[in-house]
Amino acid sequence: MAPTQLDIKVKALKRLTKEEGYYQQELKDQEAHVAKLKEDKSVDPYDLKKQEEVLDDTKRLLPTLYEKIREFKEDLEQFLKTYQGTEDVSDARSAITSAQELLDSK
């Protein structure tokens, strides 16, 4: 059976909130890696510069991700206001709550 619009919207929002956790972990790992490279005096400056660029890229990506989470959350909320289907919407409400908690913490 094909996924419904509700399933698609819920899974998309959950995927984005999960990705945020991965990006936060990547950010921590990259910060630790850059700090370690800065302590090591034998590191090639080019390698350090490239790792700092990777760190900056991750930092720049997060605000865009938060905006996407906000958009998907609002889209799901609007969808639920007019939803007339018979599916259980508790999973959708849970995803909205999780997304809102994530956004509030940032």
Swiss-Prot record:
Keywords from the UniProt entry: Chaperone, Cytoplasm, Cytoskeleton, Microtubule, Phosphoprotein
GO MF terms, alphabetically ordered: beta-tubulin binding; tubulin binding
BP GO terms, sorted: post-chaperonin tubulin folding pathway; protein folding; tubulin complex assembly
Similarity section: Belongs to the TBCA family.
Stored Gene3D superfamilies: 1.20.58.90
Protein role: Tubulin-folding protein; involved in the early step of the tubulin folding pathway.
InterPro entries tied to this protein: TBCA, TBCA_sf
Cellular component, GO annotation: cytoplasm; microtubule; microtubule cytoskeleton
Note in the entry: Present with 1760 molecules/cell in log phase SD medium.
Pfam families cross-referenced by the UniProt entry: TBCA
Organism: Saccharomyces cerevisiae (strain ATCC 204508 / S288c)
Protein name, as recorded: Tubulin-specific chaperone A
Top-level taxonomic group: Eukaryota
